Amino acid sequence: MKQHRLRIKGPAGAIETVLDLPAGPPRGVALIAHPHPLHGGSLDNKVVATLAKAALAGGEVAVRANFRGVGATAGEYDAGIGETEDLLTVAQAVQAAFPDLPWRLLGFSFGAFVQHRVAARWPARQLILVGPALGRFDFAPPPIPAAIVHGADDELIPLAQVADYARAHAIPLRVIPGASHFFHGKLM
C-alpha cells in the first residue's frame, strides 16, 4: 500500500486528505467519511480506518478527508452543508487522477449523513451507511443503491429505528451482534 497525504483546496480552505493506493491496479475508489467533528471524529477514527483497509483489500483507492475544523482542514463545522461541499471537492480532485474508476461512498455516523447528501450529487454506484445517525439528521430515501451496517447494541442510534428505515426503503441491513455504536472489539 502506498499512502499520500494531500491538502486539497476547498470552499473554506485546505482539506486534509489521505489517499491510500492498493498494491495492484485500482478497481474503484472508496470515499470514506468520518463521524461528527465536534465529538472527536476524524479521518483516523478506527471505524473509518477499518473501512479504508477493507476498500484496499478489495482493490479500491481509499480516500479519507477531515471535515472542517478537524486536523489540518480549514473552516468550522457546518452541520453537513459545508462538509458535503468539501467531500464533493475532494471527489472531483481525486477523479482527475482516476477518471475511469467506479465510486463507492462510505460514511460512519455523521459521515453517513454527509455521504447520503453527496450521493445525490456524485455519480457513485453504491452508498454504504455504517451506524447512520438516523433521527439526528435528515435521511431521505437514498438516491443510489445502498446498504447499512449497524451494531446490534448501538447505544446512540437504536437498531429498531435503523431496521425500520432499511425496511421502508428496501435497503439491505447487516447487523453486527454485540456491537456498540463505535463497534468496540468488533472491527477486523
Each predicted region: which residue ranges?
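Short beta-strand/loop motif that positions the catalytic acidic residue
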Residues: P142, A146-H150, D154
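Catalytic histidine-centered segment of alpha/beta-hydrolase-like enzymes
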Residues: G75, A179-M188
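Alpha/beta-hydrolase active-site loop
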Residues: Y77-A97
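Short alpha-helix in the alpha/beta-hydrolase fold that links the catalytic acid
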Residues: P158-A166, G178, M188
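Acidic catalytic loop of the alpha/beta-hydrolase fold
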Residues: A152-I157, H181-F182
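Short, surface-exposed "cap/lid" segments of acyl-processing enzymes
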Residues: A23-R64
